[in-house]
């Protein structure tokens, strides 16, 4: 349910207000993203400067969650984020207002320029350590 469509109703005589927000699968997705330490890893490998209103790591986190949940084009990310409860996409209400396709594009440019090999290696090792995945017979075929 979109934020603009969120229902608010008052129970008869009780004085209670019911406020409904859309969560979808994001609490579960956020659990695994946090357990992986993905935001910290992205922050280390895809650095933002002080001029960025929304860090590149946060913008990339929004895109990742969007791909998993909604698969909307980049130009519709702000609408997608506003359709869910505050914080579900890893950014607060203030940052949601600052999200734009230009800002997301700059984050993707920085990701392209980053040392993606080191980033992916750190993420794979993080999965192994935090989820108990054994790599005894793991072969990374990077030729394809």
Describe each region flagged by the PLM.
Residues 1-144:
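Dynamic "connector" segments at or just before major functional cores
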């Amino acid at each position: 349910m979109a934020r603009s469509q969120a229902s608010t109703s008052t129970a008869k005589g009780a004085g209670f207000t019911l406020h409904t927000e859309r969560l979808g699968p994001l609490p579960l997705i956020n659990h695994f993203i946090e357990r992986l330490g993905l935001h910290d890893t992205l922050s280390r490998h895809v650095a933002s400067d002080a001029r960025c209103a929304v860090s590149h790591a946060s913008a990339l986190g929004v895109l990742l969650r969007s791909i998993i949940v909604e698969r909307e084009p980049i130009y519709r990310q702000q609408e997608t984020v506003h359709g869910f409860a505050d914080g579900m996409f890893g950014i607060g209400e203030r940052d949601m207002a600052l999200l734009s396709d230009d800002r997301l594009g700059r984050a993707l440019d920085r990701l392209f320029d980053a040392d993606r090999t080191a980033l992916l290696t750190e993420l794979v090792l993080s999965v192994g350590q935090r989820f108990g995945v054994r790599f005894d017979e793991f072969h990374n075929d990077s030729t394809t």
